[in-house]
């Protein structure tokens, strides 16, 4: 099974784009060449700010959603220190128990 990664790309105007992929370098090159997400087209120079393995596709999708809900400040802490990423992944892996 191919591992999935969560990544953040910083645009020239200092915004952070969050995505998932199985190959961070390939996906980053797609974004650089304008063949990636429309949200990044025409945004100037792009830099890969953060990437980390997250597991399978399902977990990667949940992690992407969760990171997209973070504030800019929280995303900046994640980029700078990896702050809270292990806890975020742990919370996504913990099975939820339904109560009646």
Curated annotation (Swiss-Prot):
Disulfide bonding pattern of the chain: none
Gene3D superfamilies documented for this protein: GIY-YIG endonuclease
Location of the GIY-YIG domain: 2-77
PROSITE patterns named among the record's database cross-references: GIY_YIG
InterPro entries according to UniProt: GIY-YIG_endonuc, GIY-YIG_endonuc_sf, UPF0213_domain, UPF0213_GIY-YIG_endonuc
Signal sequence, renumbered to the chain: none
Superkingdom of origin: Bacteria
Family: Belongs to the UPF0213 family.
Protein's name in the database: UPF0213 protein YhbQ
Organism: Escherichia coli O8 (strain IAI1)
């Amino acid at each position: 099974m191919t591992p999935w990664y969560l990544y953040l790309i910083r645009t020239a105007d200092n915004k952070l784009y969050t995505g998932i992929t199985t190959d961070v370098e390939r996906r980053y090159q797609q974004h650089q060449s304008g063949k990636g997400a429309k949200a990044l087209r025409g945004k100037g120079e792009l830099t890969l700010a953060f990437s980390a393995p997250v597991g399978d596709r399902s977990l990667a999708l949940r992690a992407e959603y969760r990171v997209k809900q973070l504030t800019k400040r929280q995303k900046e802490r994640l980029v700078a220190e990896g702050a809270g990423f292990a806890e975020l992944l742990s919370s996504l892996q913990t099975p939820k128990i339904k109560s009646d």
